[in-house]
From Swiss-Prot:
Residues 727-778 are annotated as: Disordered. SUPFAM superfamilies: Immunoglobulin. Pfam families: C2-set_2 (PF08205), I-set (PF07679), Ig_3 (PF13927). This is Kin of IRRE-like protein 3. GO terms for biological process: cell-cell adhesion; glomerulus morphogenesis; hemopoiesis; hippocampus development; homophilic cell adhesion via plasma membrane adhesion molecules; inter-male aggressive behavior; neuron migration; neuron projection morphogenesis. Disulfide bonds join 69-127, 170-227, 271-314, 356-398, 440-499. It comes from Homo sapiens (Human). One of its GO terms (cellular component) is dendrite. It is found in: Cell membrane. Changing residue 731 to F: Found in a patient with intellectual disability; uncertain significance. The lineage of its organism: Eukaryota, Metazoa, Chordata, Craniata, Vertebrata. InterPro entries: CD80_C2-set (IPR013162), Cell_adhesion_signaling (IPR051275), Ig-like_dom (IPR007110), Ig-like_dom_sf (IPR036179), Ig-like_fold (IPR013783), Ig_I-set (IPR013098), Ig_sub (IPR003599), Ig_sub2 (IPR003598). Residues 22-535 are extracellular.
Length: 778
């Protein structure tokens, strides 16, 4: 059988099916197509398939929709089936004007387009290729139907007597699926409604009814209540509303006088009301607390700053209800914090937002500043720092100022997360052969995840490796990583050390060099602060030496004191040290007067005999002559002259005591002797010396102390000095100042050493005109 004969047979089947019912006609059409396709495949062997098939879809009633069907290279008839019923053959759907077959027929496109979907279009659809004997998967088309406009029974205005309950009923009909109803008042949902649904005869649409009960206390005059119905077909919903018309409670007006007012002044609140029926009660409250002493229209009170933010309310009541009205008082007061600013921890590059709220009256000014900076960052409640950097971290101050009233401030901290920052001394010091440390100080928020030391080919993060140990500690300021090197060698001073720290935001590196401690002092560059340990060692050694010398001097002084008990006169030797005290002398007449005065004082006391004094003067004169004839073996090296215009050179010659412990060639200096006020007493303003030193051996009340007292009261005849034989004592240079165990308060800062001349020259102040050096001759 040829193809055109099959097509003719198919048309016959179609015409025959027209005489039958729609359901039978569809079956006949399918059988006809299948028969035709079978013969065609037998004759031609062609196989077809769908490139597009209809899919399940949802459409809102009244909207167009298209069901896809495409069979490439197929030029035969396509049949659309709806719930098992054929809509027509090919593109001829004249029986259903709302349906169209669209698409390129040559490309095998046979799409079914519904121009305006209706509830009856809600069905299962299928695309069939008759000659190819294939059919598509069934596709479900769901048609959504929005509800009718909702209706509130009794609307649009519902009259209600105050105190009566309110029942509202709203229904929304003919929706698919059933609508949902909500009740609204002032934009807020009212809960507590009840619902009921009814399925309509078509089995697809539904109606819904909602009932809302409102108690009398929740109803206000002129209030609008909304009923809104929604379903999938209309998500925005449809709504209607009613207005409640009831007798209103009292209308209240509340006034405050005077305003503005300073704190601790009296104000008057007046509450006037209009009501029907008449007002039955006035009630006053502040911050929700009832004011018991107020019960009428007027309330008087003394206000403070709380009245500015805490309103006073007046509640007026009649038979239909109550009305409450509140007022604040314009009280002048200084700034008070209402919202505390909070410290922030932010990431580098992000924004930091601080909020700080104050209350004050009159209007206050808010100033945001960074602590330590005079720059105003903001005058608003909110301070926003855009793209913060690490240098933005610190303290920020929110300050509020009420003109002519007061000011207040709060401080917050901004912490910025960022890469570590290493701030360490690039040159650090250590001693050769000792243990040395290199410190790396790291500031990092968040704390560093890793810290590593590297030098040469070595890398060490923690623990010990050979001579190297790494320790890390955390402090409030940051993290300190210490590289400890034991038994430092020369090569360590030539090595470059690298300290690197990482955190989640990045890293930082510092190059540190190790320098030998004390190298600056050797090169003449001066001492550095790192040489303190050597200075401590030297100080300890010197202290030990001084202690030893003090002990030796005490022993020598004790021996000298015992040997002096048997001495009758003063014996002068060439080897004795001569201490020359250079000063200016007044006129010879004054010298004689002083000489006579001192001699008379000595005679009055009776402690020294006249001939012993004369003997001492003669001995001193002889020694002076011998000294003048003696050649200085040092060529004046130890002669320290301060002035050359002196009129005379008085010399004190001190004889030695036994035993003589000084080494050969060393100087001896007198001990147990005080120079206090000697020359100030004798010479007045014209003298050169004003020694404040007082040196006393630690031997209690001895003959040396008595000698000292008499020496201060004695005289110097003919510009010469004398000492009693019992006062003669000396200490070897090996004792130095160790022999002096007790000092006068005026001499603690400049105690005498073993060479009195050296001590005097070192401790004297050149700016003092009355103090000069002593000349010491060996």
């Amino acid at each position: 059988m040829k193809p055109f004969q099959l097509d003719l047979l198919f048309v016959c089947f179609f015409l025959f099916s027209q005489e039958l019912g729609l359901q039978k006609r569809g079956c006949c059409l399918v059988l006809g197509y299948m028969a035709k396709d079978k013969f065609r495949r037998m004759n031609e062997g062609q196989v077809y398939s769908f490139s597009q098939q209809p899919q399940d879809q949802v459409v809102v009633s009244g909207q167009p929709v298209t069901l896809l069907c495409a069979i490439p290279e197929y030029d035969g008839f396509v049949l659309w089936i709806k719930d098992g019923l054929a809509l027509g053959v090919g593109r001829d759907l004249s029986s259903y004007p709302q349906y169209l077959v669209v698409g390129n027929h040559l490309s095998g496109e046979h799409h079914l387009k519904i121009l305006r979907a209706e509830l009856q279009d809600d069905a299962v659809y299928e695309c069939q290729a008759i000659q190819a004997a294939i059919r598509s998967r069934p596709a479900r088309l769901t048609v959504l139907v929005p509800p009718d406009d909702p209706v509130i029974l009794g609307g649009p205005v519902i009259s209600l007597r105050a105190g009566d309950p309110l029942n509202l009923t709203c229904h929304a009909d003919n929706a698919k699926p059933a609508a949902s109803i909500i009740w609204l008042r002032k934009g807020e949902v009212i809960n507590g409604a009840t619902y009921s649904k009814t399925l309509l005869r078509d089995g697809k649409r539904e109606s819904i009814v909602s009932t809302l009960f409102i108690s009398p206390g929740d109803v206000e005059n002129g209030q609008s209540i909304v009923c809104r119905a929604t379903n999938k077909a209309i998500p925005g919903g449809k709504e209607t509303s009613v207005t409640i018309d009831i007798q209103h409670p009292p209308l209240v007006n509340l006034s405050v006088e005077p305003q503005p007012v300073l704190e601790d002044n009296v104000v008057t609140f007046h509450c006037s009301a209009k009501a029907n029926p008449a007002v039955t009660q006035y009630r006053w409250a502040k911050r929700g607390q009832i004011i018991k002493e107020a019960s009428g229209e007027v309330y008087r009170t003394t206000v403070d700053y709380t009245y500015f933010s805490e309103p006073v309310s007046c509640e007026v009541t009649n038979a239909l209800g109550s009305t409450n009205l509140s007022r604040t008082v314009d009280v002048y007061f200084g700034p008070r914090m209402t919202t505390e600013p909070q410290s922030l921890l932010v990431d580098l590059g992000s924004d930091a937002i601080f909020s700080c709220a104050w209350t004050g009256n009159p209007s206050l000014t808010i100033v945001w500043m960074k602590r330590g900076s005079g720059v105003v960052l903001s005058n608003e409640k909110t301070l926003t720092l855009k793209s913060v950097r690490q240098e933005d971290a610190g303290k920020y101050v929110c300050r509020a100022v009420v003109p002519r009233v007061g000011a207040g401030e709060r401080e917050v901290t901004l912490t910025v997360n960022g890469p570590p920052i290493i701030s360490s001394t690039q040159t650090q010091h250590a001693l050769h052969g000792e243990k040395g440390q290199i410190k790396c100080f790291i500031r990092s928020t968040p704390p560093p995840d890793r810290i590593a030391w590297s030098w040469k080919e070595n890398v060490l993060e923690s623990g010990t490796s050979g001579r190297y140990t790494v320790e890390t500690i955390s402090t409030e300021e940051g993290v300190i990583s210490t590289l400890t090197i034991s038994n430092i060698v020369r090569a360590d001073f030539q090595t470059i050390y690298n300290c690197t720290a990482w955190n989640s935001f990045g890293s930082d590196t510092e190059i540190i060099r190790l320098k030998e401690q004390g190298s600056e002092m050797k090169s003449g560059a001066g001492l550095e602060a790192e040489s303190v340990p050597m200075a401590v060692i030297i100080g300890v050694a010197v202290g030990a030496g001084v202690a030893f010398l003090v002990l030796m001097a005490t022993i020598v002084a004790f021996c000298c004191a015992r040997s002096q008990r048997n001495l009758k006169g003063v014996v002068s030797a060439k080897n004795d040290i001569r201490v020359e005290i250079v000063h200016k002398e007044p006129a010879s007449g004054r010298e004689g007067e002083e000489h006579s005065t001192i001699k008379q004082l000595m005679m009055d006391r009776g402690e020294f005999q006249q001939d012993s004094v004369l003997k001492q003067l003669e001995v001193l004169k002889e020694e002076e002559k011998e000294f003048q004839n003696l050649k200085d073996p040092t060529n004046g090296y130890y002669s320290v002259n301060t002035f050359k215009e002196h009129h005379s050179t008085p010399t004190i010659s001190l004889s030695s005591c036994q035993p003589d412990l000084r080494p050969a060639g060393k100087q001896r200096v007198p001990t147990g002797m005080s120079f206090t006020n000697i020359y100030s007493t004798l010479s007045g303003q014209g003298r050169l010396y004003d020694y404040g030193q007082r040196f006393v051996l630690g031997m209690g009340s001895s003959s040396i102390e008595l000698c000292e007292r008499e020496f201060q009261r004695g005289s110097l005849s003919d510009s010469s000095s004398f000492l009693d034989t019992q006062c003669d004592s000396s200490v070897s240079s090996s004792g130095k100042q160790d022999g002096y165990v007790q000092f006068d308060k005026a001499s603690k800062a400049s105690a005498s050493s073993s060479h009195h001349s050296q001590s005097s020259s070192q401790n004297s102040d050149p700016s003092r005109p009355l103090q000069r050096r002593m000349q010491t001759h060996v």
